[in-house]
C-alpha cells in the first residue's frame, strides 16, 4: 500500500472513531444516575433517570434493596423544594415498581427519595449531580421563551 493510501485509511479510521465516540456520548446524555441512597432504611443502590419519547422515567439499580417497611414509596424533590409523593415500591402479588414514569406536572428533579407513607418518614435519599429537567419542564421553558418575544 502506498503512503497516500495509508494516510487516507488512517484518516478514515480517525473520523470513524470520532463519530462512534460522539454517538456514544449522545446516548449517554439521556441517562443520569444519582448518588447512592443514604438514610435510615434505604442505604443501597442508585436511581437512574431516562427518557422514552416525552416520558421521563426513574429506575432503581440492581443493588437497591426495598426497605422492610409497610409502605415505601418513590418520592422526588424539585429545585424549588416541592416534594412529590409517587408510586409504591411494592405492589400486589410481590411485584415491584422498579421503573416509574415521572408525572408531567414535575418539571425538574433534584433528589430522589424513598418515603414510608405509613410512618410518614423519610427512609433515604439520593441526589443528581445537576438537577434533571424533565420533558414537561423543557416544554414549559420553551413556551415561556416564545411568550416573552
Regions found by a protein language model. Name each.
Residues 2-14:
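Bacterial N-terminal signal peptides that target proteins for export
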Residues 15-16, 26:
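Cleavable N-terminal signal peptides
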Residues 26-53, 86, 131-149:
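Transition segment at domain starts
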Residues 58-64:
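Short amphipathic, basic-aromatic surface patches that mediate peripheral association
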Residues 73-77:
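Beta-strand signatures of extracellular beta-sandwich domains
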Residues 80-107:
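An anionic, turn-rich surface loop/hairpin at beta-sheet edges
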Residues 102-127:
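Short, exposed beta-strand-loop hairpins at the edges of beta-sheets
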Amino acid at each position: 500500500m502506498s503512503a497516500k493510501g495509508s494516510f487516507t485509511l488512517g484518516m478514515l479510521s480517525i473520523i470513524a472513531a470520532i463519530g462512534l465516540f460522539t454517538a456514544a456520548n449522545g446516548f449517554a446524555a439521556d441517562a443520569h444516575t444519582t448518588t447512592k441512597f443514604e438514610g435510615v432504611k434505604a442505604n443501597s443502590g442508585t436511581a437512574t433517570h431516562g427518557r422514552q419519547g416525552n416520558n421521563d422515567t426513574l429506575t432503581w439499580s440492581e443493588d437497591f434493596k426495598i426497605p422492610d417497611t409497610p409502605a415505601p414509596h418513590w418520592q422526588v424533590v424539585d429545585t424549588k423544594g416541592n416534594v412529590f409523593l409517587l408510586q409504591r415500591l411494592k405492589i400486589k402479588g410481590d411485584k415491584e415498581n422498579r421503573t416509574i414514569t415521572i408525572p408531567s406536572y414535575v418539571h425538574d428533579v433534584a433528589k430522589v427519595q424513598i418515603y414510608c407513607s405509613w410512618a410518614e418518614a423519610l427512609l433515604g435519599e439520593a441526589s443528581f449531580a445537576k438537577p434533571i429537567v424533565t420533558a414537561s419542564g423543557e416544554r414549559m421553558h420553551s413556551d415561556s421563551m416564545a411568550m416573552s418575544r
